[in-house]
């Protein structure tokens, strides 16, 4: 059990905004550390400094920030969002050395190229990829790997939630997408100083959430993803279905995912992996050392009675460790998309959705006549819907009714 009354949260943003209340309920005083003077653009609305008695800002000197934080006598630090993972690692190694994730593999838990390299070194199967800012080098690599003219994925080495992830179709112009990503500022507020080119993986994608204590990994939840593409944008979230721990799909994924967690040096805390089950077996898309975002904590708790936030507080404050999870009810989450940007004209299209037998919850993210962005990633969804029911056919029937509503959405040109 923890002795210090303070809990330091690095970037309590996105899902991490749920940490302050959870730690307060457990008797802790949450302390916020922001990895910059302002939160990254994608997380601005989730920054609530009033949730904290103490807020500290990182201005570039890790050692100086660590000295500021020593007054709290920290026994651990937790990252709240992707943007805080690296700083949290650095502060942990200074303030409570040897208690965090493997420091030498810190970049492998954040940079997708380093991630794949860590898998290669550990002998874990991975997708072929290259990180470069030089299109000539990229072309040489594509030729050497017999990938020129094949379907490819192009994305920033450091991004999240499907931001700037593009597919290049067979014999497509990969250079155009390469140039589109290189040099841009992504939604984490980082400049893309290189581009990641990856072989395209076909199969079924899964989210595998875990929690680790002293290097022993346990499952928190597992979901099957359904994602869609629009033009050359792929990985647009459309639907998730929660699976039971004893499901054969889960049993096929979990041994591989544990190898991934070991390879990138996750020794304690949350793991959030996206894994594609291909014809050649499971392959990592990416893994993160922080809680799942995008409203996932709510749906995880509904489906399993637990989530990353609760698991973290139970371990850090009370010393409780849980092995595995129980699926307590069947849940399907739906991400409603805007097919174009413009004026959202018919919010009433969702009238009557509450009468669906499996309806549980819905959040429409924009008002009538508001200008909405085209949905291209998790940040730009138009609405979220949660369906819960014991009968699979009822879930399917109601799901298709929601799709009919989505198809009837009217968005006028701006």
Task: Identify the residue ranges that each predicted region occupies.
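ATP-binding N-terminal substructure of ATP-dependent carboxylate-amine bond-forming enzymes
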Residues: 1-105, 136, 366-380, 388-413
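A conserved helix-loop-beta module that forms one wall/lid of the active-site cleft
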Residues: 94-164
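Conserved ATP-binding module of the ATP-grasp superfamily
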Residues: 125-127, 147-154, 168-203, 233-236, ...
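Short, flexible turn/loop "capping" segments at secondary-structure junctions
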Residues: 156-159, 233, 375-380
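Short, well-ordered beta-strand elements within core beta-sheets of diverse protein domains
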Residues: 166, 199, 241-242, 381-390
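ATP-dependent carboxylate/phosphate-activation module, predominantly the ATP-grasp catalytic core
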Residues: 172, 179-180, 199-266, 270, ...
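Peripheral (often C-terminal) accessory segments that flank ATP-dependent C-N-forming ligase machineries
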Residues: 313-414
């Amino acid at each position: 059990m923890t002795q210090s009354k303070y809990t330091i949260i690095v970037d309590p943003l996105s899902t991490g905004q749920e940490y302050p209340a959870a730690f307060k309920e457990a008797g802790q005083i949450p302390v916020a550390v922001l990895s910059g003077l302002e939160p990254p653009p994608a997380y601005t609305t989730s920054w609530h400094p009033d949730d904290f008695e103490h807020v500290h800002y990182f201005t570039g000197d890790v050692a100086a920030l660590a000295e500021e934080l020593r007054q709290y006598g920290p026994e651990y630090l937790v990252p709240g969002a992707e943007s805080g993972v690296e700083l949290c690692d650095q502060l942990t190694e200074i303030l409570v050395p040897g208690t965090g994730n493997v420091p030498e593999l810190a970049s492998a838990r954040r940079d997708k190229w380093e991630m794949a390299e860590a898998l290669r070194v550990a002998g874990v199967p991975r997708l072929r990829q290259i990180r470069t800012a030089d299109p000539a080098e990229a072309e040489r690599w594509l030729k050497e790997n017999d990938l020129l003219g094949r379907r490819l994925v192009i994305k920033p080495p450091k991004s999240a939630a499907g931001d700037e992830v593009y597919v290049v179709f067979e014999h497509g112009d990969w250079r155009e997408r390469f140039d589109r990503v290189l040099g841009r500022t992504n939604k984490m507020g980082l400049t893309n100083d290189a581009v990641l080119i990856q072989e395209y993986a076909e199969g079924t994608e899964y989210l595998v959430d875990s929690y680790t204590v002293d290097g022993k990994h346990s499952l928190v939840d597992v979901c099957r993803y359904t994602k869609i593409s629009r033009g050359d944008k792929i990985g647009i979230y459309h639907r998730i279905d929660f699976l039971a721990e004893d499901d054969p799909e889960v049993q096929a994924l979990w041994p591989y995912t544990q190898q991934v967690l070991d390879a990138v040096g996750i020794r304690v805390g949350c793991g959030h992996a996206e894994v594609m089950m291909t014809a050649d077996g499971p392959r990592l898309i990416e893994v993160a050392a922080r809680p799942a975002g995008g409203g996932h904590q709510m749906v995880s708790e509904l489906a399993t009675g637990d989530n990353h936030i609760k698991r973290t507080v139970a371990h850090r404050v009370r010393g409780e460790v849980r092995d595995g999870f129980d699926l307590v009810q069947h849940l399907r989450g739906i991400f409603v998309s805007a097919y174009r940007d413009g004026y959202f004209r018919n919010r009433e299209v969702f009238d009557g959705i509450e009468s669906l037998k499996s309806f549980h919850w819905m959040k429409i993210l924009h008002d009538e006549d508001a200008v909405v962005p085209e949905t291209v990633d998790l940040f730009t969804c138009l609405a979220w819907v949660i369906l819960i029911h014991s009968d699979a056919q009822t879930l399917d029937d109601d799901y298709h009714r929601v799709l009919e509503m989505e198809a009837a959405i009217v968005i006028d040109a701006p």
